[in-house]
Structures are given as structure tokens and as C-alpha cells.
Amino acid sequence: MAVPFYLPEGGADDVASSSSGASGNSSPHNHPLPSSASSSVSSSGVSSASASSASSSSSASSDGASSAASQSPNTTTSSATQTPMQSPLPTDQVLYALYEWVRMYQSQQSAPQIFQYPPPSPSCNFTGGDVFFPHGHPNPNSNPHPRTPRTSVSFSSGEEYNFFRQQQPQPHPSYPAPSTPQPMPPQSAPPMHCSHSYPQQSAHMMPHHSAPFGMGGTYYAGYTPPPTPNTASAGTSSSSAAFGWHGHPHSPFTSTSTPLSAPVAPKMRLQRSQSDAARRKRLTSTGEDEREYQSDHEATWDEFGDRYDNFTAGRERLQEFNGRIPPRKKKSSNSHSSSSNNPVCHTDSQPGGTSQAESGAIHGHISQQRQVERERQKAKAEKKKPQSFTWPTVVTVFVLAMGCGFFAAR
């Protein structure tokens, strides 16, 4: 049976509940229903969860409407939350709330079993589904009487509430895990509870608790974690227990990094490890190795590029190709493309014993050829220049003359 609960700060009057419904916490369970009405709504939502989302929303609303009408004969509009104790809400809001609720149920029941964990949360970088409360054993320190969960997470200002509302991972009803990770409390404050939901709560409590937070928010792009039954893989619970995360289920997040840097961290770590490996490889070789091409363990392109840079450092830095360039014919396109296809092949295939002097001579030859080429191209460009220079001048003069003519005519 679903348990109705009230907004803590709003005072639970009609104005607060309707405004919360308008502000996007669209769920029929924000509003103080009588328990029978809310249970009928939840049962209709469960029964219609297997149908398509649009039809199921309409059927759920009609079911709820019929049950509400049977309770109070004076209500005629088809609204599931319209009870005598409340001012009526506009029907489209209620329909939208029901639709969201049913879609949440559906996505939880038919979610593909691809990922085993909810996505990384911005405010808590524990990934396992059962971090704070291991599935098998109920939490020893939890209160015997769980408090009614609250829709607002006791922030001081509403902006923070909205910020965290967008980035909630969507919990599954059978998770005893935290549905709303709270932001890091100040370190001087007494430890906040890491989650609102305790293992003793019924599974119906969770949809109430998570529905106000939208469908997973924009941050996760509609991803809802697949249902993990209470008998979750023992591997995850035991491995996360091995790291000692279960020891302090109520302590503040002392081990979390700054909220938004958590998703970025693995990528940075990967890049750093790769570059470290390359640097280590480079440092193991001797200095002479770097200068001459006699090393037997020329492994990566990285190292190859580094050594190549080392012994071409003294020469001109801006080179057209690394390889040897055959003298060009008049039609430069064919040979140009063929030589650009294998830029490194010639220097790569030098025998291991070529000394630095030989390679230096080769490079001197290449640079001479290159200078000759450049001079040729400069000469060509200078020939072309007068022709190409006359056209723009002619055009600009013509345009200016036309403009002056227009002005004079005015």
C-alpha cells in the first residue's frame, strides 16, 4: 500500500502542493491524498505498466478517476488526485504526472540488462548499486522506525534543490541503495544520512521518493539503471565491502572528490598512464641510443618520432616531408602525391648501422633540393603576381567608380 507524505516546508496546504506540481515535481504522490486514493492510483499504474506509455497513461487516469468518483460522487472531472479535501488541479498536469509515473514503472520493468550499475553520480562517486546498504544483510545502524522520506533534501535555497534534481540517477524500487545522493555537507556539521531510504521500507515507498526528481534528469540523457533484484550479484556487494565503504553508512562523503570532476577523472587517469608508460620506455634507453639509430627495441611510433626530432633538431624545423624527395618533373602532381604517401619510409628503412654523419649528409641533400624547389616556386609566383594583381585593382576601381556615380546622381 502506498504511503502518502507531505512537503516539509510547504505546510501541506493546497497552494504549496499545487505549486510543487506546477514546478515540475509532477507526481500524484506529492499531494496529501487519503491513503485509499493513492493506493488505487498506484495499483492502476502498476496494472497498466505493461502497455505502451501513451495508452497506459490514459488508462491509468481513467482508473484513478473511476475510483475517485466512487468515493466522492460530487466530483465529475476525470482527475485522479481531485478529492474533496483539495482544490482541483488542471487535468493536463495530472495526466502528465500519471504519464511520468507510468513511464517510470515501465522503464524499470523493461530496462535492458546491459549495465550493472547506475551511472556515476556528480555528487557521489561510488558506483555500485548497493554501496551504502549491502543487499544481503540489513543495515545494523539504521533506525528501527524509518522517517517518512522528504521531497526536499534540506538545502538552504531552492536553486541547489533544482540543481540536484536535474542530476539524479533514477533508482529502482527494489534498491535499498540511496535514491538521492545528497551534496557534501560542511565538514563541521553532524553527519547527514547518506540516503533517505532504509532497507525496512516497502518497495512502494521508492517511486514516491524518486518521482519528484524527474526522469533521470538531463544529465543522464534518459538512462535508467536496470532492475537489480535484492539478490544482486554477490561479487559487487562483496567487492565494495572489501573497500570498507559499508563501515560508515551515515558519515558525510569524505572520500568524494569535487562533484563535477568525478566523471572526468578516469579519462585523465588513462591519458596520464599512457604518457607515463611512453616516458618510462624512453628513459630506459641510453643517451647514445637516442642520437643514433642503433637501438634494437624501436617499439612505438612515439619513440621513433622523438628520436627523429632529436637528430633533425639542428636543421630547419619546417620540412615538407620526412622522406627523401625525388627530383620533380614538370607535372608535379603525380610525383608529389606518390612521395607524400610514404613520408617516413626512406628514413625508416635505413640499416641499423647508419651513423649520424650519413643521415646528416642525406638530410643536407634533401634540404638543398628543397631550397631549389622553393626558389622555383617563388619565381613562378612572381611571374603570376602581375596578372593576378591587376584583376583585383581593376575590380575595386570599377566598384569605386560606380559608387561615386551613384552618390553624384543623388
Curated annotation (Swiss-Prot):
Q: Does the keyword Repressor apply?
A: no
Basic and acidic residues bias spans? 292-301, 371-380
- Coiled-coil zones: none
- Give the GO terms filed under biological process for this record: antennal morphogenesis; apoptotic process; apoptotic signaling pathway; autophagic cell death; cellular response to gamma radiation; cellular response to starvation; dendrite morphogenesis; entrainment of circadian clock by photoperiod
Residue numbers bearing the Phosphoserine modification: S295
The phenotype of cells or organisms lacking this gene is: Mutants contain extra cells in the head owing to decreased levels of cell death and show a pronounced defect in the morphogenetic movements of head involution. Ectopic expression in the retina results in complete eye ablation. Reduces levels of caspace-3 after exposure to ionizing radiation. Simultaneous knockout of hid and Clbn/NEMF has a similar response to single mutants after exposure to ionizing radiation.
Q: Where is the composition biased (Polar residues)?
A: 71-88, 149-159, 343-358
UniProt biased composition (Low complexity) = 13-27, 35-70, 134-145, 230-242
Positions of region (Disordered): 1-88, 126-207, 230-301, 319-386
Q: Which UniProt keywords apply?
A: Apoptosis, Developmental protein, Phosphoprotein
Q: Where is the composition biased (Pro residues)?
A: 170-189
User: What does the UniProt record report as the effect of altering T148A in this chain?
Assistant: In Ala5: Induces apoptosis
Please list the disulfide bridges: none
**GO CC terms for this protein?**
cytoplasm; mitochondrion; nucleus; plasma membrane
Name the source's superkingdom.
Eukaryota
Molecular function in Gene Ontology: BIR domain binding; cysteine-type endopeptidase regulator activity involved in apoptotic process; protein sequestering activity; ubiquitin protein ligase binding
Q: What is the effect of changing T180A?
A: In Ala5: Induces apoptosis
Name the protein family.
Answer: To D.melanogaster grim and rpr.
Cited function:
Activator of apoptosis, with grim and rpr, that acts on the effector Dredd. Seems to act genetically upstream of baculoviral anti-apoptotic p35. Blocks Diap2 from binding and inactivating the effector caspase Drice. Might regulate apoptosis downstream of Clbn/NEMF.
Give the record's subunit note: Interacts with Diap2 (via BIR2 and BIR3 domains).
The protein's name in its UniProt record = Cell death protein hid
Q: Which gene encodes it?
A: hid
